[in-house]
Amino acid sequence: MSALLFDVDGTLTDTGGAGKAALGPAMIEVYGETGPIETFDFHGRTDPEIVRGLLTAVGWLDSEVDDGLPALWPIYLERLAEALDQVGDRAAPLAGVLDLLDRLTADTRFACGLVTGNLEEGARLKLRAAGCADRFEFGGFGSD
């Protein structure tokens, strides 16, 4: 059996900016600011790296950021679920993804997994919104 690994954002799904829309208010609630969230490049980073990058850019120490992460994640995940509800059908699988996943999951030669910087629950929320959460047997996440 071969493992086939997929990223979430921009590979499997387009969530209409729900992640950024959720992170900003959650960061304000926990840290009182977001840093340069509108210009910061989220791609290729784990969720913890994104928060550290945003706040260290405005003078926070890594240790100060890390101290707030346990409080941030539940708020972020709640806001993410709300943001995904608001974007509705715009939280969708990219073209051809569902057909590809249907073929791969039906073929016993393959096991589909996730490799993503998203928190595990954040990835699952995004995939549920896109209608493909049940296609993945395992994964590595930004929360690991």
Predicted region positions:
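Active-site neighborhood of HAD-like aspartate-dependent phosphohydrolases
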Residues: M1-H43, E49-R52, T56-G59
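Short, acidic loop-to-helix structural element flanking the phosphoryl-transfer center
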Residues: L5, E82-L114, E120
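Active-site cradle of extracellular carbohydrate-active enzymes
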Residues: G117-N118, D144
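Histidine/lysine/aspartate-rich catalytic loop segments that bind and position anionic ligands
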Residues: L125-D144
